[in-house]
Regions:
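Beta-strand elements of repeat-based all-beta scaffolds
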Residues: 1-19, 23-97, 102-133
Length: 133
């Protein structure tokens, strides 16, 4: 399947791609350009940035509230929006899909993935690490 990479930011991060015979997909980057914080399927990057301008700062530093997450999705009803929150240098801590349902990721003292929980705080998956001497 062919994909056209339409645009990049000044740090070389992909900001928009279009699958063959498909709709554009915008990627918004945060945490000083280190991590993708939103994938918006169905509109261009320029339109996404324009429509989300009031939320970009909070989205880019991971401080968007649950209420703001919902409002963000209502701004662009024609698009499917997935958002990501990170603990820098560790990993993703929350992924919220287009349906508004979140998965939360927790890490142990050594920054290894420990659990994945749903938005009702129910454990979906646990990880154990065993080392052999």
């Amino acid at each position: 399947r062919k994909i056209v990479y339409n645009s990049y930011d000044t740090q070389g991060n992909i900001t928009q791609y279009t699958p063959e015979n498909g709709l554009p997909v915008a990627i918004i980057w945060g945490y000083n350009g280190q991590y993708p914080i939103a994938k918006i399927e169905g509109i261009t990057h320029d339109i996404a940035v324009s429509k989300l301008k009031d939320y970009l700062s909070k989205l880019q530093n991971g401080t968007l509230s649950d209420v703001e997450q919902k409002a963000l999705r209502l701004l662009i009803p024609e698009a499917m929006i997935t958002t990501y929150v990170y603990k820098p240098l560790v990993g993703v801590t929350q992924i919220t899909g287009p349906n508004g349902i979140s998965e939360n990721y927790t890490y142990d003292y050594a920054n290894r993935l420990e659990e994945i929980k749903n938005d009702k705080n129910e454990v979906l998956k646990t990880f154990q690490y065993n080392y052999k001497n």
